[in-house]
UniProtKB/Swiss-Prot annotation:
Its EC number is 7.-.-.-. PROSITE patterns: ABC_TRANSPORTER_1 (PS00211), ABC_TRANSPORTER_2 (PS50893). This is Uncharacterized ABC transporter ATP-binding protein YfmR. SMART domains: AAA. Residues 295-304 have a biased composition (Polar residues). It comes from Bacillus subtilis (strain 168). Residues 560-629 form a coiled coil. Belongs to the ABC transporter superfamily.
Length: 629
């Protein structure tokens, strides 16, 4: 049964058409994911459905007394309310009852012997029974706990941005609604909370419509995808994975149709140019048909960004941290941290919110001076730093002028030189948009522009602080492809599980109280291992033995030896690949003996390096065997 119908919605923003007479309906208990490039109007469509924005043409009808709850991307909570007062705000009978009960409980707590206040509490409890509000009360406390909101008496104006988002989510989940609309619900949430929210939404009693950049979340929560692109809305039954398959089919069909149109147009033009004899009416029909074919537009790709920008050469010394200590407000964030970053690494930094991940990232990039220890950055290192905050972007600059401040020309990975205008076009900023003022861009478009500006600096070490926030899934896919080809080092803080699985090969894990551990592998591998460790029971006999016997300090490799061991197999594979490539280059050199001599010298050097690496692998493996025996 449909709970909401939208017919022929039309809306523009400036000279851009956001919705070109789109129609759709939302069924009970549907889970809809709305996707599309930044700036296409996804958040606007959510607000239109929620009744928060108007449309120029079309109509939205709701069946009966359908209730809609809306989560803003950056919620602004009313000052003067506590967390609990905000959670229970609303005009439903249940919310009014909960407010009365909490007030009676609070007043009695101040004067427990007051008979009048005791009567008020008894009356409030009776009302809770009558309105079946106890379940809502339990749900509210559970949701707040799961979202990490513990102090319900705190004024909302004292909360951080992330805490406000959590409180807003809690309010939306608790309020009775037939349709729950969520705009980027996973922003500011840690991965454990996101996984809980996935499970909660799968059991939610109403329909859900959401915009999110988190592709795992999108895939696990939704059963229908709406794709908003260039004013049109395409619908797909299934989750994000099914959508990717079906969109590829749709684009292939559109390309076939365009090929047929082009062939027919060429045939008709050839006929007319030959001046073939025909009755004038028939000739006129051909001319009309040619004009019609010319006016038809071919399919436009869903968009492809080209991130193939060059980078500066990176030497062997990248970044080394020795006994780094960082404290904040009397709390230890980083305690005696040691790290050796080697060329080509892909490192993810993970941990709960507010634990110090961004602070460590800033320290490794030379932006924050640690309280103790040393951080050494190699002389050839050229840092590109993508931060969460792009508020320093001058809104009065035009798009093209902002990019030209970094570079007017940039070299691609292939060695070609392209202009700032061409680079912007590759980033889905057409010429017509390049004269737009930055203040007029959507949040996602600003992030994409900022990303381009960072990459145009041609870095060889890329620091990414929550890069997936506010970027559309399309841009994220291409950023991941860029990282695949990027020859330098990538160090990222991210809560995006898909992104971490896709780009990093080892993790720096914040455990709390300044303790930092490491994990070699993907984020999903790390989570599986963590869950297995928590689930594994500890044998009582072993625990008693461990208590009775004096603890023996376990021997292990030195820190630098362990780092070398972690990366040596990759190093051997790279040298083997290089040796094979040189062999092929020698064969292809033909009779160019000067070139052959040069290649053979390089091959001999590579063979020596490979042999030395193999010897070192043997040496380290023997050391490990001895330590484990």
């Amino acid at each position: 049964m449909s709970i909401l119908k939208a017919e022929n919605l039309y809306k523009t923003y400036g000279d851009k058409t956001l919705f070109d007479h789109i129609s759709f309906h939302i069924e009970e208990n549907e889970r809809i994911g709305l996707i599309g490039p930044n700036g296409t109007g996804k958040s606007t469509l959510l607000k239109v459905i929620a009744g928060l924005e108007s449309i120029e043409e079309g109509e939205i009808t709701k069946s009966g007394s359908v209730q809609v709850e809306f989560l803003h991307q950056d919620p602004e909570l009313p000052a003067g309310q506590t967390v609990l007062e905000h959670i229970y705000s609303g005009e439903s009978a249940v919310m009014k009852t909960l407010r009365e009960y909490e007030k009676a409980l609070y007043e009695l707590g101040k004067d427990p012997e007051n008979e009048q206040r005791q009567k008020h509490l008894l009356a409030a409890q009776a009302k809770m029974d009558a309105n079946n509000a106890w379940d809502a009360n339990t749900l509210a406390k559970t949701v707040l706990s799961k979202l990490g909101v513990n102090d319900v008496t705190k004024p909302v104006n004292e909360l951080s941005g992330g805490q406000k988002k959590r409180v807003a989510i809690a309010k939306n989940l608790i309020q009775p609604a037939d349709l729950l609309i969520l705009d980027e619900p996973t922003n500011h949430l840690d991965n454990e909370t996101i996984e809980w929210l996935e499970g909660y939404l799968s059991q939610y009693p109403g329909a859900v419509m959401l915009v999110t950049h988190d592709r795992y979340f999108l895939n696990r929560v939704t059963n229908r995808i709406y794709e908003l692109e260039r004013g049109s809305l395409y619908t797909y039954k299934g989750n994000y994975e099914v959508f990717l398959e079906k969109r590829a089919e749709r684009e292939a069909q559109a390309e076939q149709k365009e090929t047929k149109r082009q062939n027919l147009l060429r045939r008709e033009l050839a006929w007319l140019r030959r001046g073939a004899k025909a009755r004038s009416t028939k000739q006129k029909a051909r001319i009309d048909r040619v004009e019609t074919l010319k006016e038809q537009t071919g399919p436009q790709s869903s968009g492809s960004l080209d991130f193939a920008i060059g980078s500066h050469r990176l030497g062997k010394q990248v970044i080394e941290a020795e006994n780094v200590m960082i404290a904040y407000d009397g709390r230890m964030l980083v305690d005696r941290f040691n790290e050796l970053v080697i060329p080509g690494e892909r490192i993810g930094i993970i941990g709960p919110n507010g634990i110090g991940k961004t602070t460590l990232l800033n320290a490794l990039a030379g932006r924050h001076t640690p309280d103790g220890g040393d951080i050494t950055i190699g002389q050839t290192v050229r840092i590109g730093y993508y931060t969460q905050d792009h508020s320093e972007m001058n809104g009065e600059l035009k798009v093209i002028d902002y990019i030209k401040e970094t570079a007017e020309v940039v070299k691609t990975a292939d060695g070609d030189m392209i202009t700032a205008e061409q680079m912007l076009e590759r980033f889905l900023f057409p010429r017509s948009m390049q004269q737009t003022y930055i203040r007029k861009l959507s949040g996602g478009e600003k992030r994409r522009l900022y990303l381009l500006q960072v990459l145009m600096q041609e870095p060889n070490v890329l620091f990414l602080d929550e890069p997936t926030n506010d970027l559309d899934t399309e841009t994220l896919s291409v950023l991941e492809d860029y990282i695949d080809q990027f020859p330098g080092v990538v160090i990222t803080v991210s809560h995006d599980r898909y992104f971490l699985d896709r780009v990093v090969d080892r993790l720096i894990v914040f455990e709390g109280n300044g303790v930092i551990s490491r994990f070699q592998g993907s984020y999903s591998d790390y989570m599986e291992e963590s869950k297995a460790k928590k689930a594994a029971p500890k044998p009582a006999a072993e625990e008693k033995t461990a208590e009775a016997e004096p603890k023996k300090k376990r021997k292990k490799l030195s820190y630098k030896d362990q780092l070398e061991w972690d990366g040596i197999e990759d190093k051997i594979a790279q040298l083997e690949e290089k040796h094979e490539q040189l062999e092929a280059d020698i064969a292809a050199a033909g009779s160019d003996f000067g070139k052959i001599q040069e290649l053979m010298a390089e091959q001999a050097k590579t063979a020596e390096e490979l042999e030395a690496a193999m010897d070192r692998w043997t040496e380290l493996s023997l050391m490990i065997e001895e330590l484990e025996s």
